[in-house]
């Protein structure tokens, strides 16, 4: 009985430490799933936490990448009254070259400081301003537009985006299944060619 009570106390304490999150919600515009997690983290910690989110079958978790106005509006509505929320944009590698750091868009440039948008972008007026190592994208959920901010800033939350996985079968298993299937086809063809046809 004492062991059960101790386990219950530990489980309750861990539950209190868990960050509150909204329900996982699907955006009809792209079929992806989204989850807002309200917790104070740096951008790097949010990037890691999103990638480590509880798996959903057929989906891969990552920090949100916002690639359309519809997705932008959906994500902002999902975050409610949160003040600042992390997204996966960064120009840490090359100043002024904003790329997505996660998801299927990882490595894709979406904004060039000297030229403007290459893909979808929704910066506040005068942003990104690249002041003092502001290399990470967050947005003001209540105001709606994007801002660049420094690495040690702790935002009020982040959004996990669950993108459909390319395949639910790991690649090594795919090769094994392909080879096994080809072997079965070969065996069937050999058996078929070795059959004798008897005329009635």
How does the language model describe each region?
Residues 1-3, 200:
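N-terminal secretory signal peptides that target proteins for export/translocation
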Residues 3-4, 134, 170, 189-191:
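Residue-level micro-sites within transmembrane alpha helices that shape
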Residues 4-5, 196:
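A general lysine-centric signal
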Residues 7-8, 74, 199:
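Intrinsically disordered, low-complexity segments enriched in glycine/proline and serine/threonine
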Residues 7-25, 161-184, 188:
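Short, threonine-centered small-residue motifs that mark membrane-proximal processing/anchoring sites
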Residues 11, 27, 92, 103, ...:
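Compositionally biased, low-complexity repeat tracts
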Residues 22-168:
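Extracellular, disulfide-bonded carbohydrate-recognition/adhesion ectodomains
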Residues 187-200:
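C-terminal membrane-anchoring or membrane-association module
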């Amino acid at each position: 009985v004492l062991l059960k009570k101790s386990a219950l106390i530990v489980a309750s304490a861990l539950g209190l430490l868990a960050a509150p999150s909204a329900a996982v919600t699907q955006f009809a515009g792209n079929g992806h799933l989204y989850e807002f997690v309200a917790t104070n983290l740096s951008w790097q910690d949010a990037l890691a936490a999103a990638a480590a989110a509880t798996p959903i079958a057929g989906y891969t978790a990552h920090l949100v990448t916002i690639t359309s106005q519809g997705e932008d509006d959906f994500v902002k509505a999902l975050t409610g009254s949160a003040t600042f929320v992390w997204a996966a944009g960064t120009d840490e590698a090359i100043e002024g070259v904003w790329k997505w750091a996660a998801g299927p868009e990882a490595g894709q440039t979406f904004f060039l400081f000297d030229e403007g948008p290459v893909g979808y972008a929704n910066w506040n007026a005068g942003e990104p301003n690249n002041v003092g190592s502001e290399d990470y994208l967050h947005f003001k959920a209540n105001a709606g537009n994007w801002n660049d901010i420094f690495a040690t800033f702790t935002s009020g939350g982040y959004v996990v985006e669950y993108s459909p996985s390319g395949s639910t079968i790991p690649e090594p298993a795919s090769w094994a299944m392909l080879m096994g299937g080809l072997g079965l086809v070969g065996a069937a063809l050999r058996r078929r060619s070795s059959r004798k046809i008897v005329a009635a």
